[in-house]
Swiss-Prot record:
Residue ranges of the region described as Disordered: 148-193
Protein name, per record: Biotin carboxyl carrier protein of acetyl-CoA carboxylase 2, chloroplastic
GO cellular component, one term: chloroplast stroma
Originating organism: Arabidopsis thaliana (Mouse-ear cress)
Keywords attached to this entry: Biotin, Chloroplast, Fatty acid biosynthesis, Fatty acid metabolism, Lipid biosynthesis, Lipid metabolism, Plastid, Transit peptide
Tissue spec. comment: Primarily expressed in 7 to 10 days after flowering seeds at levels approximately 2-fold less abundant than BCCP1.
InterPro entries on file: 2-oxoacid_dehydrogenase, AcCoA_biotinCC, Biotin_BS, Biotin_lipoyl, Single_hybrid_motif
GO function term, MF aspect, one: acetyl-CoA carboxylase activity
Transit peptide residue numbers: 1-87
Composition skew (Pro residues), residue ranges: 149-162
Low complexity bias: start-end ranges: 163-180
Length: 255
């Protein structure tokens, strides 16, 4: 039988070096009885050998492959736009804003990736709505203002001239040669101080200068008319409750 000898020192050194390498696992091999006999010097001195197994680049069934971007955990990564894409998108948006301002565009919608922009222009709608009620309100206002002027024009002027000539007609001309007492103002002639009361003077009464002989109402004021001289009432020329004008003869007083 040939004998086999292996220096144990080299094997131990190899064990220390190999065991310290990353990714390499060491496993001690134990001989099992298989019916093969070795010389006594071999079986006693070399009963164990080291088996090396490298695990580098081995793929296990439950391991995750590594990609350039990192390990994939089974979930989809979120797509984040790059700065260049954002700048290009904003350039398009600014161009669209200029387009909306220069054209009659009411609404514009832009979608790109996960971004959505809606541009609405309300100036056109606001200018179109208000004119409608304005036109409906104008015609009735013009019609209302045109109607009233025709009514007040005809009524007031007619009664005033008819009443003034009536004042001069009832006044009778004095038959006496003495100058009459004339009215100093226009108004309504009253012989008594109030309704149902006796008159101030009658025909044939003697009066004194400064004595009240009648009342003339002008502008809602009662004006007392006094005798200009002392004498006797000869004639009564004005009618009670009738209007008189300036210088209308009222009485004839004879001294």
């Amino acid at each position: 039988m040939a004998s086999l000898s292996v220096p144990c020192v080299k094997i131990c050194a190899l064990n220390r070096r190999v065991g310290s390498l990353p990714g390499i696992s060491t496993q001690r091999w134990q001989p099992q009885p298989n019916g093969i006999s070795f010389p006594s010097d071999v079986s006693q001195n070399h009963s164990a050998f080291w088996r090396l197994r490298a695990t580098t680049n081995e793929v296990v069934s439950n391991s995750t492959p590594m990609t350039n971007g990192g390990y994939m955990n089974g979930k989809a990564k979120t797509n984040v736009p790059e700065p260049a894409e954002l700048s290009e998108f904003m350039a398009k948006v600014s161009g669209l804003l200029k387009l909306v301002d220069s054209k009659d565009i009411v609404e514009l919608e832009l979608k790109q990736l996960d971004c959505e922009i809606v541009i609405r222009k309300k100036e056109a709608l606001q200018q179109a709505v208000p004119p409608a009620p304005v036109y409906h309100s104008m015609p009735p206002v013009m019609a209302d203002f045109s109607m009233p002027p025709a009514q007040p024009v005809a009524l007031p002027p007619s009664p005033t001239p008819t009443s003034t000539p009536a004042t001069a007609k009832p006044t009778s001309a004095p038959s006496s040669s003495h100058p009459p007492l004339k009215s100093p103002m226009a108004g309504t002639f009253y012989r008594s101080p109030g309704p149902g009361e006796p008159p101030f003077v009658k025909v044939g009464d003697k009066v004194q200068k400064g004595q009240i002989v009648c009342i003339i109402e002008a502008m809602k004021l009662m004006n007392e008319i006094e005798a200009e001289k002392s004498g006797t009432i000869m004639e009564l020329l004005a009618e009670d409750g009738k209007p008189v004008s300036v210088d209308t003869p009222l009485f004839v007083i004879a001294p």
